[in-house]
Amino acid sequence: MSRKSKASNREVASRPQHSQPPPHERPEPVARALLQGWLSWLVPVVIALITCAAFLPTLQNQFVNLDDNDNFLDNPHYRGLAWTHLRWMWTTHQGHYIPLTWMTLGLDYLLWGMNPVGYHLTSLLLHVTNAVVFFFVVRWLLTRALPSPSERGYALAVSAGVAALVFAIHPLRVESVAWVTERRDVLSGLFYLVTILVYLRACEGEERGRRWYWLAVATFVLALLSKSMVVNLPVVLLILDVYPLRRLGGAIGWWSEPARRIYIEKIPFVLLAAGASAIAVMAQSSVHAAASLAQLSLPGRLVVSAYGLGFYLWKMVVPVNLSPLYELPRTMDPVAPPFILSYALVLAITAIVLALRRPVPGLPAAWVAYVVVLLPVLGILQSGPQIAADRYTYLAGLGWASLAGAGLLSTWRRWPPFVLTGLAVVLLSGLGTLSWNQVEVWHDSEKLWTHALAIDPKTSMAQFGLGRVRADQGKPAEAIEHYRQALNIKPDYGAAHYNWGVVLGQQGKPAEAIEHYRLAVQMRPNSADAHNNWGALLGQQGRLADAIEHFQQALRLKPDFAEAHNNWGFALAQQGKRAEAIEHYRHALRLDPDNALAQSNLLNAIQRRDMGKEDSAQSRKGEKTE
């Protein structure tokens, strides 16, 4: 062998020696496996602890008079899990079909009674669980989306953990977690995330894939029974099929045989979503919650939709001045500055997404998923007084949080890890602090509405809510002033007239109270409460026949209205119709077994009836004696 060939051999042999790190810097395979296994469990624990810490003040919060009073404080139907409670839960009530959510609230009642701490604890634990499940979802997605993820055990775990925390402790999550009424958000979110995780598992292999697939269908059913907003999930799964699963589009195409199989496997999800959507529309119609075209025109709905897309993006980046209610403007000016800025932001994001669709394929996936998830609440089917709501971002924020984790992982080798970790700590500390402060806004009704008015003094519902607080505090003059302010902002605010009437009735001013009830019914013809109270005041004036007409109308509008049955019974008793009165008292108690007034009235009516029978018997006996 020549010297040249020997030298060549030496050069070939020497290359691996210079490319490998020193032995003490090379992690052994066993050590690497132990590190990755340790991180797989440590990171979720850290996520859970940080999320709990950020939302800890919620355990001191009370029920608030933003739907909590109607759903819990004044609603005996959910209090338990007996057959009568379950029958009520599994039928459409109060504008939503959420039987599984009601069952968790019924369990809360059995465990805690009416102590709000238990309700808040359950919501918090569900949210913490969602954060942990989302960590596993993101880790799986990053493993598929980015090259050579197996070499980044620590980086992968940290990036997925940061993504989970960006979702979990963002201030936009506070409304869903700290407001008991929104239990449906955190519960449906749990089954939504579990469905995605199980679906990803089903896509991994053929042997047990079908079992995982049908398990995903089953968990989707549970999500739909918790809140209908999850109907977007079939489309989100298709987006995941495109990226990062790469089961659709690209080399596979859109209409090839493998692609058609992808579409076919979505049929059960689509059918379930369609059924849930139909039930949701019927539920909204039953309480007249949907806005008519006369109330909000089609161009106005398009303006609201564009505004919502821009508004939520802005609040994700700058989560300050968050309010429990962003009220729909009385007049919709499409060229007003807030709307113009929203259009510009949406167009700019769309342009960026199109420009970066090849180098950053996760960006269009996140953008399309964001739009799809928000679509039901973007104003096309407007429901409620709000133009936007923080709670609507609970699922819509998942894609952007995943993208944040992907961005961190993709820059891990280009930036020093301690710099990236430091930036993540600063970001998460800021989000956690803002969330802590926002949770305290939801402590009680007074803080809630005072905060809302500080953000926007022209929010009629906030004036109304604060008026109810003052009425409960025994401050009728201040309550009336807030109702007056609410009506100045929104002259057709029937609920403000109703509550004004309640205060006047308590002040012993029946004529003035009746006038406000009349206006309330004129503005809200479906107000059973206004008819009931109007009838009660007429009964006090001795106009029993007129009073009974209002009780009948109240029960036509609200058949399970125990108080109306009690009042009708009382009017009948005054007319001397004790047998009919007793039947109405009993009906009231079947609807509300704890109704103390109906119990007392029933006992008195039975005693009077029995006394009458005794008097009659004594009278007949006397006649026979004579």
Which residue ranges define each predicted feature?
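Polytopic membrane enzymes that build or remodel cell-surface glycoconjugates and lipids
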Residues: 2-495, 499, 529, 533
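Conserved alpha-helical positions within TPR/SEL1-like repeat arrays
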Residues: 461-471, 495-506, 529-540, 563-570, ...
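Terminal, low-structured helical/coil segments at or just beyond the last alpha-helical repeat
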Residues: 582, 586-587, 594-626
